């Protein structure tokens, strides 16, 4: 599991991108239109007096397949759940499990103690604990 602390502000849409509340949804800057398809796994994001905690359901992965990026005001979690074929040719009657790259972008309200951030992947769940710098 790769974990990086970054001291720059996060730019969600990238350079040159504009966010419009109204207007033609098909007219977007080229880098956004050409982005690879990503999915978003189920997530619980909770806050207590002393910390923020994120729990993500992503079974079938290893710690090395996650990248956790901690920006000044956003936590970004990326990964790539690989497709594991059974080897036999088959037709699907139902296919609800998502595979491939995923990305979560979660805002961080307030200051956190970056030296005490921890992450653990266990039994199909990735849990990230973000202790508050000044707990209330």
Outline where the language-model segments fall.
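N-terminal leader/pre-domain low-complexity segments
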Residues: 1-53, 78, 83-87
